[in-house]
């Protein structure tokens, strides 16, 4: 399934579970397979978060969250297809197999849940920050591709990779 952001900013494109509820049955977990998120590319798109997982015991299999770095002229750019974060996981015991998150303007992935596991994480940081001032926070230059909350005591990431090429302002 393809979830395509529209021109009006969406706070969240797909939300699994109610925030802070975390209700789920470990013997019958929620699963998402082959879900693709697109912000920009063929047309202007805007969203604050692409995927937010609030339930426990969720399986994410082949998720691709993409803020466009190319496409139809006028459909992408730092101020055009805005998107803070690709994936936020708040649930416990969430497993992701094949998590691809690319070009978001803040943390690409934030993992707040306990006992999370990701097997294969692929990431490209945004190519298009206009300058360093636009791409920093709290005295930190840039944003992490995969941020595990300081409060999390157990998390595993197997086969993670991230790379970046700043092509607008390489300073």
For the regions a language model picked out, list residue spans one by one.
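Extracellular/periplasmic carbohydrate-active domains that bind, remodel
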Residues: 1-171
